[in-house]
Each structure stands twice: as C-alpha cells, then as structure tokens.
Design a protein with these regions (language model features):
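MFS 12-TM fold signature
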Residues: 59, 84-91, 176-180
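Paired intracellular helix-loop junctions of major facilitator superfamily
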Residues: 125-135
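C-terminal transmembrane helical hairpin of 12-TM major facilitator-type secondary transporters
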Residues: 74-124
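Multi-pass alpha-helical transporter architecture, strongest
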Residues: 174-196
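Hydrophobic alpha-helical segments of secondary membrane carriers
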Residues: 18, 140-144
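Interfacial helix-cap and linker-helix signal at transmembrane-aqueous boundaries
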Residues: 37-38, 69-71, 155-164
C-alpha cells in the first residue's frame, strides 16, 4: 500500500471529510465557548473563567472512558459516532437554555461531543494503513481538519456578527457533527480491527 494509493483510497477521503466536519464544530465550540457561556448566563468573566473547567473536565473523563470502553469492546465506530451525536444534542440545545445552569449543562454535552471520541478516532486510520501510507493519509486527514478549524470559528463569528446570536452558528455546527457521526457509521466494520 503506497502513499499515493492511500491518498486516493475512498476510506481515507471519507475520514478526511469526517474530520473536516468534526473540526468545524470542535474549533467553533472551543474558540467561542467562553463568549457563548457569558452571553447565555450573564455571569461575570471571573465566574465564566472558572466554569469553563467543568465542561473540559467532563470531556476529559469521557475521552478516557471512551478509549477504555472501545479497547475493551473492540469497537470504534459507535464509540466515536455516539460522542458526535451527544455533541449534536449539545449544539442544538444550548441556544434554548432556560437558565445559566442548564446552559452550562448543554455546553458540557457539547464539550463531550467534540472531545470525547478524539482518542479512539485517531486509531482508525492505522487499522488499515501503516508506514509511509499511514503518515500521508493522517497528514491529509489532519490538513482537512485544519481547514475545518478555520471555517468553524470564522463562521460562528460571522453569523453572530450578522444576527446578534450564536444560535444559528450552533445549529450549523450541530448539523456538521451529526453528519460526521453518520459518516463514521458508514465506514467498513473492518476498521474496528487492525489488519495483519
């Protein structure tokens, strides 16, 4: 399997598209989270700064559990897709939070979604690639994610600037996360295990 074959492989191209969509949500959320929490809660900046530790801690714990559970069950696709679907719920529900505490809860769900499956995700390309092919494919996947990392924050800022609300940007990022989750489930089951 050469590097050129890897870069033309439909599985690699699908992984690149998935990561592009995922990272739109990942960086859009990460970049704007403090401002979104402040606007939804009305809390002073010092409280917002401390509150950010809560969703990040939740995401860390889920990421550790997700990796452990994936390894134990020898399953990857549903572990990653489930976190993305949880993130979708967080993105879609956050703008409708009736109280600061509920908005923080939905932001926790979003954080779990954008961070929770990341460790398991990066084991997927190496189930069918190795050596230079794996390096080239992972470079392509990561580059497409970097493009998503530009789109997400810029898009959310643009939408907020034109509508005065983060809601529509959160809906778009939720849709991106949902589509990424669906695409994960279309990957072949063989990507659950490393090929010999």
């Amino acid at each position: 399997y050469t590097i050129w074959q890897a870069l033309k492989d439909p599985k690699v191209l699908r992984l690149a598209l998935i990561y592009f969509l995922w990272v739109i949500g990942f960086w859009g959320f990460s970049f704007w989270m403090p401002q979104v929490l402040k606007s939804l809660s009305g809390w002073p900046p010092s409280v917002v700064a401390w509150s950010i530790a809560i969703p990040m801690t939740a995401a860390l714990l889920v990421q550790i559990y997700c990796g452990y559970s994936s390894e134990k069950r020898n399953e990857k696709r549903w572990h990653v897709a489930t976190t993305l679907f949880i993130g979708t719920i967080g993105f879609l529900a956050t703008p409708h939070s009736p109280s600061p505490e509920v908005s923080l809860f939905f932001i926790c769900l979003t954080a779990v979604g954008v961070y929770g499956g990341m460790g398991v995700w990066w084991t997927m390309p190496t189930t069918f690639l190795s050596g230079a092919a794996a390096a080239g494919a992972m470079g392509l996947i990561n580059s497409s994610g970097n493009m998503g990392g530009w789109v997400g924050p810029y898009m959310l800022g643009f939408i907020n600037g034109h509508t005065g609300s983060f809601a529509y940007g959160y809906y778009v990022m939720g849709a991106c996360m949902f589509l990424a989750g669906l695409l994960i489930l279309t990957l072949p089951k063989s990507m659950e295990h490393k090929e010999d």
